[in-house]
Swiss-Prot record:
Originating gene: earP
Organism placement in taxonomy: Bacteria, Pseudomonadati, Pseudomonadota, Gammaproteobacteria, Pseudomonadales
Gene Ontology molecular function, alphabetical: protein-arginine rhamnosyltransferase activity
Species of the source: Pseudomonas putida (strain ATCC 47054 / DSM 6125 / CFBP 8728 / NCIMB 11950 / KT2440)
Catalytic activity: dTDP-beta-L-rhamnose + L-arginyl-[protein] = N(omega)-(alpha-L-rhamnosyl)-L-arginyl-[protein] + dTDP + H(+)
Record-given protein name: Protein-arginine rhamnosyltransferase
Function: Protein-arginine rhamnosyltransferase that catalyzes the transfer of a single rhamnose to elongation factor P (EF-P) on 'Lys-32', a modification required for EF-P-dependent rescue of polyproline stalled ribosomes.
Amino acid sequence: MKATWDIFCSVVDNYGDIGVTWRLARQLVAEHGLAVRLWVDDLNAFTPMCPGADATAAQQWQHGVDVRHWPAAWLPVAPADVVIGAFACQLPAAYVEAMRARPQPPLWLNLEYLSAEDWVEGCHGLPSPQPNGLRKVFFFPGFTDKTGGLLREGSLLARRDGFQQSAEARRAFLQGLGVDLVPGALLISLFAYENPQLGNWLDALATADQPCHLLVPQGRVVAGLSQWLGEGPLHVGDVRTRGALTVQVLPFVSQDDFDRLLWSCDFNAVRGEDSFVRAQWAGQPMLWHIYVQDENAHWEKLEAFLAHYRCGLSDDADAALLGLWRAWNMDFDMGQAWRAARQHWPELQQHARLWGARQAAQPDLATALVHFYRNSL
């Protein structure tokens, strides 16, 4: 009999939380043959990344996953063999009580946010006894072999390589999004939160020697583009040109198409957790817009990742990359930082590829979770 898994997702950051849990659920079904229920409290955040999904359905099957609406008024269900609470979400009290009542309590995992901070290695896999007698285990994704690794489907990098080696596949995909490539242009994707340095970066792109084609999926940063252009709201399909820069607004796409978008671009600026990991697998230079926390607590998390990611760069390229990421996240001059990074482009390209290869040498997150469960039996 298949092991049953329940994954609970409370949507906080629009698409980041559901993005991670939806990828995980799909992979557990497709590659490990598990029976997975994904509980989501806001299906409106789920439907944009899963075409054909119904935001009003209490239950639906998508890609082999039993997707359930997590209602405010909980209805009794039998707990699964493995229960994952994503990102410290609080499970329904009645469900937890049903877990306790099982003859063999489920494996209860708290899937934490991704972090490169040193303390993660020491906390990964730690049990947390609960007052009701159950035991919850902290499971941390991460960038070292002492963590749970990163989400990565088994065929991902082979599919990426095949796509990137086919100019026709890239052209056809982009045309399907309504993108007619500007000849000789640097192709950039931008998926970000509001950012005070956006205008400085756009100015640098518009005045650069090489043309640039900026692809912007629907999202929070689009309003900043409209402001920079000095016009009303931009809509999907709109294309505007200023100087050397062409800006184009794209529709929100499925996760698989978002991967292809990242693979298609020469540079990817991303936000949150899911797109952050997928940009790393794209093997192209990238920039992460980290989620802002009170008292700039996110800066420590940013610097922890950079301490890993920068290893192996020359001193000059290292300084340029560090300057670019700090400018975008700490409100320094993004125009100057971008021009400095462009001076080291070949090295940054090679480094991005090598980083992905090093991460791929470690077990992926879904496999690590399955092994953890099997070892617990």
